[in-house]
């Protein structure tokens, strides 16, 4: 750790000593907006002729050029669906000009109807459902992980079980796990979360992260319920290379790189990228179930390799044809908490090939096609063959089975679970004039599983895992209406769910096995509306009845510690959200945003992971009611200081009248649901400036974040002395400094500055104070 501190100090000294000429340089800062409603245009291109240099507008339409000499510059600003505009900008020595560039939307004739093109920023901000957008400016170059960024988002928490590579579950307004959709470029990844974690996506490749709360757009496909996270990747310049290396506490190392090339004359874009992560995760943890003794994690090594490529053609019959091969390889030791696990580990590999086809005016005028197909082969290997297990005092005990085993019930395992998956998502959008849009979405999932565990069969004396076939289809139809003056927007969606499964199952400790043949369907509907009271003030109201299909693991278990539960029913959620948004982004220097939302949810057939005396199982828990409120304010306090603050109160209560499958009154009715935080808050400040040490082409960011989670219960609050997960307050500090007009970045971060004790769900200890430093180079 001392070496890490010395490294950070050396980098800070390097930044201070790296100064160029002391001449007073000029700069340009501005925003690009739609000329009719002042909405910022995310991703608009700004090109300075004299510099032969360009930039892309950020999430608020902002852009900046620094370190300029006095003189006159020509800025060419363009955006898809808008007329290109040229601006002459004259700078005096030492002057930073602030400008607003308004682009006029193009119009396309569809017969007798005129359809005005809409930019991506307008589509996002004008949606009727609650959505938080995290821009590339909050991501690029920093030591932050995606988890760090999402944890600061109002209404969102990340439930981690340990350090780097530990299981991470996203929670939105208290709903978590497979209820929350995980998407990359609107492609569902929930079926592959055993192989691709939300933190695996190289953060420097991300343009923005969209967090949907409550109603999830049907165009995403799948059966997400209660919320979704969609990661949108960057669009790169014609020539681009990006490489970074980060070193963090607990012997953690991260390497990420991407290379892109655009051959415009042939309409071909290709690239490769990837990342490698290694960590020992050897932090000291405090075991609350053993009188708070402190032990160093000794079996939590983690390695992951992620490689990907892309070939995109823009001059074939389709507007865009893309092929993307991906490989993900993971190795993870299994760290013990209740006992000292020393040998068990997991290896997994995933091979994925994805194809995307896009075509505007497909077959008929006004009909846009977007179809993606992916084929995946995955191999998941759990090895647990230790002949004895240990307690935390170092005492050894023989395994239950002569074949070994130290996990769960301590029966040996050498599982090889292979799966072949095909996913297809079809999105058809038809524009009917300026005010009406119809969208049809179809999402097919085919999964054939081939598990094998000869060691387990020898250990327990029977076959426990079987081949399976699972098919599901979700169809969605959405009708959008937008008033002529753009004050009112309504989005009505209906969904149909169908799933089938064919396999066999056997109780872990019972005799015999049986056929499992499921064929079920369901229906959901939701509506969301938005009304502009003033150009800067809008109200949102949404309500929905959504359904989530049980996953394969929930239905079939894992043949080891999780028993089958093929009788599981789909979850059903009734939700209402009402909110207000006051937004001055791009209209006032403060870029002030104030948002408040109230929400209600009633979840039926809640699927819950429950541990028993022998093994565990997913069960339909019954009913749960949620009432909550969230609020956020963020603004540029000055031209060099940005601040934000948010708070979430989410009251999740057991709503069952009776114990499951009985007439016995439920003793926990009305009690708060355990293991779910109910009061959270975040706040932060960011100082940013140009050429703080003189010279030119340098930018500096220094930030501080504080997060608070109130104490909550480990189990239902039945007695005053029950175990609780304690209140936690953590502070993070960090910096980022860039050189040569954002070509070289050096950043550092201290997480959990005060070394506060932090426990996650089920009292799992999380890392204390840690350090990280990162260097990144961009060639464009």
Sequence positions of predicted segments:
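Short acidic/polar hinge/loop motifs at secondary-structure boundaries
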Residues: 66-67, 187-213
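Face-selective signature of the C-terminal outer-membrane beta-barrel domain
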Residues: 314-329, 348-510, 514-526, 530-538, ...
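Membrane-embedded beta-barrel scaffold of Gram-negative outer-membrane proteins
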Residues: 532, 540-544, 570-627, 648, ...
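N-terminal periplasmic accessory domains that precede
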Residues: 97-102, 146-149, 166-171, 183, ...
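Short, acidic, small-residue-rich periplasmic hinge/interaction motif at the N-terminus
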Residues: 33, 37, 44-49, 78-82, ...
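Periplasmic-side early beta-strands and strand-to-turn transitions of outer-membrane beta-barrels
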Residues: 238, 246, 263-344
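Extracytoplasmic beta-strand/coil segments of soluble accessory domains associated
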Residues: 131, 147-188
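Gram-negative outer-membrane beta-barrel transporters
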Residues: 593, 598-602, 620-713
């Amino acid at each position: 750790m001392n070496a890490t501190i010395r490294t950070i100090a050396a980098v800070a000294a390097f930044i201070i000593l790296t100064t160029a000429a002391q001449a007073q340089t000029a700069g340009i800062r501005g925003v690009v907006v739609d000329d009719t409603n002042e909405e910022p245009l995310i991703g608009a291109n700004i090109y300075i002729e004299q510099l032969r240099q360009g930039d892309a507008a950020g999430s608020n339409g902002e852009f900046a050029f620094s370190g300029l000499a006095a003189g006159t510059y020509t800025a060419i600003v363009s955006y898809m669906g808008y007329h290109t505009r040229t601006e002459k900008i004259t700078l005096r020595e030492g002057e930073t000009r602030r400008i607003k560039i308004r682009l006029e939307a193009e119009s396309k004739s569809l017969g007798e109807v005129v359809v005005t093109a809409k930019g991506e920023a307008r589509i996002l901000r004008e949606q009727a459902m609650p959505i938080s957008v995290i821009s590339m400016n909050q991501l690029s170059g920093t030591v932050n992980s995606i988890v760090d960024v999402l944890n600061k988002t109002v209404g969102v928490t990340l439930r981690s079980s340990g350090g780097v590579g530990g299981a991470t579950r996203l929670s939105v307004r208290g709903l978590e796990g497979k209820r929350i959709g995980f998407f990359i470029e609107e492609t569902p990844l929930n079926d592959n979360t055993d192989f691709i974690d939300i933190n695996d996506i190289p953060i420097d490749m991300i343009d923005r992260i969209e967090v949907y709360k409550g109603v999830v757009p049907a165009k995403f496909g799948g059966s997400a319920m209660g919320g979704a996270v969609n990661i949108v990747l960057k669009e790169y310049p014609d020539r681009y290379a990006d490489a970074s290396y980060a070193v963090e506490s607990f012997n953690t190392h991260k390497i990420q790189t991407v290379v892109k090339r655009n051959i415009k004359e042939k309409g071909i874009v290709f690239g490769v990228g990837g990342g490698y992560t290694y960590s020992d995760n050897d932090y000291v943890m405090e075991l609350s179930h053993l009188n708070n003794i402190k032990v160093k994690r000794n079996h939590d090594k983690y390695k992951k390799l992620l490689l990907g490529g892309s070939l995109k053609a823009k001059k074939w019959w389709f507007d865009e044809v893309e092929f993307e091969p991906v490989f993900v390889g993971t190795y993870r030791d299994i760290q013990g908490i209740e006992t000292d696990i020393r040998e068990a580990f997991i290896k997994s590999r995933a091979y994925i090939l994805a194809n995307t086809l896009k075509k505007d005016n497909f077959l008929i005028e006004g009909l846009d096609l977007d179809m993606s197909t992916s084929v995946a082969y995955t191999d998941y290997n759990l090895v647990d063959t230790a002949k004895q297990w240990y307690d935390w005092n170092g005492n050894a005990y023989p395994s239950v089975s002569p074949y070994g085993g130290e996990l769960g019930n301590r029966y040996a395992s050498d599982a090889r679970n292979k799966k072949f998956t095909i996913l297809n998502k079809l999105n058809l959008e038809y524009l009917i004039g300026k005010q009406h849009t119809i969208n049809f979405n179809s999402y097919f999932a085919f999964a054939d599983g081939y598990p094998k565990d000869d060691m387990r069969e020898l250990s327990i004396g029977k076959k426990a895992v079987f081949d399976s076939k699972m098919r599901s289809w979700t169809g969605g139809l959405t009708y959008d209406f937008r008033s002529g003056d753009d004050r009112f927007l309504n989005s009505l969606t209906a969904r149909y769910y169908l799933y089938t499964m064919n396999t066999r199952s056997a109780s872990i400790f019972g005799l015999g096995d049986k056929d499992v043949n499921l064929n079920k369907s369901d229906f959901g509907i939701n509506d969301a509306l938005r009304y502009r009271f003033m150009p800067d003030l809008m109200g949102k109201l949404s309500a929905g009845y959504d359904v989530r299909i049980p996953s394969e693991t929930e239905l079939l278990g894992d043949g080891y510690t999780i028993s089958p539960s093929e009788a599981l029913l789909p979850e059903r959620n009734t939700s209402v959200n009402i909110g207000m948004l006051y937004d001055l982004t791009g209209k006032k220097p403060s870029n002030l945003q104030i948002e408040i939302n109230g929400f209600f949810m009633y979840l039926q057939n809640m699927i819950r992971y429950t541990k028993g005396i022998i093994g565990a199982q997913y069960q339909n828990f019954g009913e749960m009611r949620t009432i909550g409120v969230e609020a956020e304010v963020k603004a540029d306090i000055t031209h060099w200081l940005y601040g934000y603050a948010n708070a979430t109160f989410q009251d999740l209560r057991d709503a069952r009248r009776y114990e499951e499958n009985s007439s016995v009154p439920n003793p926990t009715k009305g009690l708060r649901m355990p293991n779910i935080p109910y009061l959270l808050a975040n706040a932060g400040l960011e100082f940013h400036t140009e050429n703080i040490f003189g010279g030119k082409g340098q930018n500096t960011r220094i930030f501080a974040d504080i997060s608070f989670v109130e104490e909550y219960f480990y189990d239902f609050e039945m007695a005053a002395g029950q175990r609780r997960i304690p209140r936690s307050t953590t502070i993070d500090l960090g910096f980022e400094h860039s050189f040569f007009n954002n070509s070289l970045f050096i950043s550092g971060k201290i997480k959990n500055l005060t070394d506060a004790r932090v426990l996650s769900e089920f009292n799992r200890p999380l890392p204390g104070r840690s350090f990280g430093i990162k260097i990144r180079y961009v060639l464009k």
